[in-house]
From Swiss-Prot:
UniProt family annotation: Belongs to the arginase family.
Native source organism of the sequence: Pseudomonas fluorescens (strain ATCC BAA-477 / NRRL B-23932 / Pf-5)
Binding site for Mn(2+) 1: 123, 152, 156, 243
Pfam families assigned to the protein according to its UniProt record, in alphabetical order: Arginase
Catalytic activity: N-formimidoyl-L-glutamate + H2O = formamide + L-glutamate
Keyword entries, A-Z: Histidine metabolism, Hydrolase, Manganese, Metal-binding
Binding-site positions, Mn(2+) 2: 152, 154, 243, 245
Descriptive protein name: Formimidoylglutamase
Amino acid sequence: MISNAPMHLWQGRIDLAEGLAARRWHQWVQPWAEQQPAGIALLGLACDEGVKRNQGRTGASQGPAALRAALANLAWHGTGPLYDAGDVTCTDHHLESAQKRYAERLGLLLEQGHLVLGLGGGHEIAFASFSGLADHLRRQQPCPRIGILNFDAHFDLRHAPQSSSGTPFRQIAEYCRQAGMPFEYCCLGVSELSNTQALFEQARELDVRYLLDRQMQGWNLPAVEACLDAFLDGIDVLYMTLCLDVLPASQAPGVSAPSAHGVDVQVVEHLVRRARASGKLRVADIAELNPGLDQDQRTARVAARLLASLIH
């Protein structure tokens, strides 16, 4: 099911004394409609069926609403249009149908020239986002080289009888194989203790570029930047996805699988901005926000900040 933009969630402070320069996100965003000027389009996937199938803690289906509420009161520093394109909702456990609908709506937004920012939902959003982008770009000849940049404690390359939040990048690899496209996947922040030897072997077989969470520290930032830059130099178009469990549990408690180590938000935000500055970003999303597990809206707030860093 696709629902219209939940504009009632966009509420916040209004500073009348400072005038137009004091606008916040809730004063700038407008519901998406066709035939509007190109801008930034927010699209939610209200789904955690993939988390359930992956034996995780459910609740991420409420993530898009919580993320909108956290974004609403942020100061707006952008210039172009900002649209809310509503939510695709997973009903009756039909994850694959929800992913297909999300991919189709994302493709429509790309056709209209928008930068699409996805609001998760479980990390099953990744396959939906990539397939929507790839389907759109494959109409071009030759098809641009798509790079997948994932900030995540997990490779999400599992083999499983059903798709889940643990399988999206294996699904993407299979999509690429069938389409004759290169599988360009870079995963930053991997937790060695949260990924089995089998998953590391799968990553090696697929030529995945990755850095461990313990490598993604401020003292090692030049090496991390070099790794990211080399990846970005080899692609034409970037899809970026950020799983909030890449952050330490102290910064992001509201996820299905909190990280004991993680990568500090300052490092993640710096790299997100660096990737955005490449000029290659077409689609990005944030995944695994679970409001029911959050503390003082800490995870929602940091998610909102990271999403805002893609714009400001």
